[in-house]
Amino acid sequence: MSQLLVCRMKPYIQPFERTLALAELSALAHSDPVSVDQHTSNPVLFSIPPVVKPAALARHLAYWETIEADKLYFTTQVLRERTVNVVRNGVPTKDIQQLLFADEIGLPNRRCLRYGTHGIHEYRGKFFPQLVRSLINIADVPKRGIVADPMCGSGTTCVEAILGDYQTLGLDMNPLSVMMARAKCSLLAVSPDALASAYEAIRGQLLRPAGRRSAKLIYFESLPARDREYLSEWFSVQVLQDLD
């Protein structure tokens, strides 16, 4: 493997992300990337010496789409991001796994933040997942190393660490944050078949015609008095019945 590797940067990223993109590529390749398309104001093609296997680069890079070597390698990151397009198209769950690897599913043309379990819960001020991945690359975290986040919020850093095959530790004082972070991380270990089965079961229940609503709030009444008082201030009795 003597030819230069040509890496294509995502063309739609922001200036600060371009800086991170070049920094992560430099850290992983152990050399400074050289612009191939210097005639443009915002070049997206950069070459590096073949000191690292293109497949390894493709597994780690956050802000890049492809690596051209003996063949064209798509980065794992961009393949994960394009899964959002499949789900949004309303494809049946039984067909999703096949379509994820189909050529007709295009690459994203804008920033995608909700792939994997990242879209489960919105958290104000959350990290961009790609930012986390690029910083892990720049920090040169060793294989199976520990990535810790002392204020993990909804778990973006922890999820990216797991996706990158690192160990992770997240801390937060907010119980809701802890619950969401655990849910996001735990789901990554669930088999696709089990997840699809659970989804279809829940979907079936939600789409089932509503029966006669019970006036008794069984789950609501099992909550502590403080929680019942709080929920009653926010929701009407009808909504509480629907939630119950």
Regions found by a protein language model. Name each.
Residues L5-R8, A27-V141:
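Class I S-adenosyl-L-methionine
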Residues R8-L20:
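Short, surface-exposed ligand-recognition loops at beta-strand->loop->(often short) alpha-helix junctions
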Residues E17, A21, R124, F128, ...:
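Hydrophobic (often cysteine-bearing) scaffold residues that line and stabilize catalytic clefts
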Residues L20-L28:
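Short alpha-helix
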Residues K143-G153:
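Conserved class I S-adenosyl-L-methionine
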Residues L163, Q167-G170, N174-D244:
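Class I S-adenosyl-L-methionine-dependent methyltransferase module
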